[in-house]
Amino acid sequence: MTRNVRVDDPTAEEATALARALATRFGERVRVFTADGDEPVAESDPAEGDVSGRPDVDAEADAGPTEREERLWDEIEDILEGGPEKYRERQREAGKLFVRDRLDLWFEGLTFEDGKFANFDAWHPNAPGTDDESEGGNGGDGDRLPADGLLTGAATFEGRAVHVAANDYTVKAGSMARHGVEKLLRLQSRALDNGKPVLYLVDSSGGRIDQQTGFFANREGIGRVYYNHSMLSGRVPQICVLYGPCIAGAAYTPVFADFTIMVEGSAMAIASPRMVEMVTGEEITMDELGGPTVHAAESGSADLVADDEREARDLAARLLSYLPDSADADPPRTEGAPPANSPDGIDSVVPEAPRKGYDVRDLIDRIVDADSTLELKPAYGAEIVTAFARLDGRPVGVVANQPAKRAGAIFPDAAEKAAEFVWTCDAYGIPLLYLCDTPGFMAGSGVEKEGILEKGKKMIYAAASATVPKQCVVVRKAYGAGIYAMSGPAYDPESTLALPGGEIAIMGPEAAINAVHARKLAAIDDPDERAREEERLREEYRRDVDVHRMASEVVIDEIVPPSTLRDELVSRFDFYATTEKDLPGKKHGTII
């Protein structure tokens, strides 16, 4: 087998040295080419020890690596083994991959790795000042600290250059200390400078408590990691995957990342179950405290849940496919595809009766490209669907009321979920498609205590502040402040479209009639006559709020035949793709 390597303009000596070193390392023939050359400038075959491409080579002098280089290779091989074998075995028993096997699953080799020798002096027998006969800096296998428990570097993922940070759980349970923190800070700083996405493969028990003096509160300590997360937010995509229980400091990276994927069996919490019991007396398991179900359905901290490590990788790949390398780049467009189901059926999917439920995902499937939808946080705030999808290959963020859940009324969790999704799409230049079919924000003492006004405000603020192209479609009902939250006419969408059954009103007919005509109706003794009068008032109200009236008053831009909705949206997103908007000059708003 022959391995070919391309290098930008190497000298003859550099090419020869590289060929020889790689041939020795990989145990196969290596040919080195210039970046655009057709013929190799150097070759090396480890079996025969021959080197070509360098004039007048002394075969004996250049027979292979020196003893010094061999010693270095031995040290590297030792580092690559990770922590003690017993901890690698525990990883296997837990159904988890060793971190370097995990990287093999994700990438065809790292482009490069930084900091393999981090904390080398503290454990390796070859370290300066260490007795060669000892097993480590402190004399035991359990003291192995290869790479200080954190791997950092760069790789190509699905054709994209990315930064990678991955905890090695075989090293002190993936805990973080001074050198690992330094590596992570450097990676984040470089990502901020060069504008490439960051993948965090997190499997960490948090900070090393016995070493906190060196990294906890320092200006360049672990606190700076979250500062850097904040600076990277909205600048380059940050995707985090959780593989095991992540406690305290380790649990902040997932929530700071733009997107978090939890593998079944993982967990994250501000404190361990033991600490929780000590502080509160509550006895609880790690899964009950912060497992995937908790964060996917109750806290909203997890965007996606994967059954296993391979699915986690596939979900991350799908996520990245919608995202640009940085806020300065355009989201990647692909070749378009027809929808999974024909747009001709849109009108039959949406019931004529305003209060009848249906699954809005059936509507989405007739609008967007087939197999292009990735719903985020599906179990959290399920009254609103937030999803990435493609329209003729263009990535879009879909925000859709879900009449199949609580009639599509907007509850606090759903409002917060939608606000965060809109904010993220806007940060990375992803256009927004709103599909509005809601009776408005939910009312009642329960939702008031849960912050419906505060969280509803965030959703409205996000719609108002988003400067990416927006299209609002009034699918059926748009009542109350729901039309504001769904980026209606007052919120500067490029277009407000409506299907023929749409209604825009302060409230629904029943509520309006009760508010305005309650006494008049109560004065009618005959039940049949009262019912007829209610129906008359209802129809009169409906005519007043019917979408045709709104189109006549130019409140909306167009009533669209349902079967043409997809084509209409494709054309409008194409036309407005280069739209630029500026917010008023200010440091930032006060709403978060």
Outline where the language-model segments fall.
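A short, exposed loop/beta-hairpin motif centered on an aromatic-Gly-Thr core
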Residues: 4-12, 37
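A short, compositionally biased
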Residues: 24-29, 150-151
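Long, folded non-catalytic interaction modules
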Residues: 38-44
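A short, charged, amphipathic alpha-helix used as a generic interaction element across diverse proteins
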Residues: 12-25
